Amino acid sequence: MIKINQLKLPVGHSQKDLEDKIRKTLRIPSKETFHYEVMRRSLDARKKPSLFYVYCIYVTIRQENSIVKKLHQPSVSLVTETGYRFSEMGQERLNRRPVIVGAGPCGLFAAWQLTLAGYAPLILERGKQVEDRSADVERFWKTGILQPDSNVQFGEGGAGTFSDGKLNTVVKDPSGRNRYVLETFVKFGAPSDILYDAKPHIGTDILAKVIKNMRDYLIKHGAEFRFQTCLKDIQIKENALQALVTEDDTVIPADVAILALGHSARDTFMMLHQHQLPMEAKNFAVGFRVEHPQQMIDDAMYGNGKRNALRLPAAPYKVTSNFPNGRGVYSFCMCPGGYVVNASSMKEKTCVNGMSYSGRSGKNANSAIIVSVSPADYGAQDPLDGMHFQETLEHKTYQLGNGKIPQQLFGDYRQNIASQGYGDFNSQTKGQTCFANLRGLMTEDMEHSFLLGMEHFSNIIPQFDRSDAILSGMETRTSSPVRIMRDTNGESRVHGIYPGGEGAGYAGGIMSAAMDGLRLADDVMKRYHPVY
């Protein structure tokens, strides 16, 4: 197979244009047939208003060695496609089926691999299945009535279900897990373009259907799900897991448990800490959701009027900066054509997130603009101090908005006065809102960094710091505030406990969490033989 890198064509090109470009690049005679697959497509807007798609293409043709040798071009090479493969099973026999705690991306993909390999896992999920969960979330947004275990953070699919649904990751992936996850999503209903888009996106509406289809398949092939089943305790003997205890005091004997908890399972973090599972505080970031008109972002990223003229998707952006005080300020979970959502999961605590549907057709762009937080900011004497710092910010936000999302125009934030109304555009939110003064939620040093960041980003995206940009508070759940320690085999200090995913501090989004779930399943398989 031949790999062509950096094959560039103008946006708006035809399929024939692409085929002709491949033929020209490889000097394939007009009568010679070939097959090709697009492996990656990215948008190059560095020379706007001229926009280009840049491709990575795999080509199958006769005499591949000869073609590559004659061309002698760095962008053309021979490759052997190798997909993700499960490890061979270990020799130790499991006396009981493995248990997975959490049905987010990490838990679902651990369940996927173990189910296909014949381990028939049991999946415990504190929230509801995605259909019922979606109804609870919509009800919360309309009424403010919160279900503590069925909300934007908890339930089948995990926190990423109500987000932008990004499927990109910076995790290095020589094993092929990345593409395997994408292929699995496509198998259960995701659009096939996620396989090659440089910034793949699935959207809340499609992701919910994919999750349901995946669950149905797993059940049909031997997995068991128990929803509304919260882990309350673990039983340990001689430093080995003996059983899991659920909220209703059901005892589930277990030799192996994959803990795919999610970044908001604070009660479970505390329970594990009481059992002295080694964990450490880690860096995270907090800030505000910031909304701009999507057209403003489109024009900045593509050139004036280019989005409609070339039928391009709503433009994303990514901005970052570092300042002399040691803090980083950057965008996080940017949602083109999206909504700001109330993402709370605890009583009297408010936090926000961003969410997009698959079409990204909303009028506003939003992103978290967040400020880095280190253990030095909250005097970490205990591994859970970062978690308590988050809770303090969320409680202050709840009090400020009386349970609603508190909002403020950036110009008013800069002047330290409460807003009275919107400017040239309105907010797009899921959840009740009110105007307030968001100053004082963060420390003065963090506020100063946030202001510097907004001003700096206006040098990259014109009018980014416009006075009527809408801030919503607070974004606190950017990542887990703790890391549950594990060894190179994925196991914690307690034999049989495998912590993973975003909650354990080993992932940062749908893809990396799913890949970590596969890795943990692989770790279990390499050691144990399934119960038959």
Locate predicted features:
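Residues forming the flavin
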Residues: K3-Y53, Y58-F162, K166-Y532
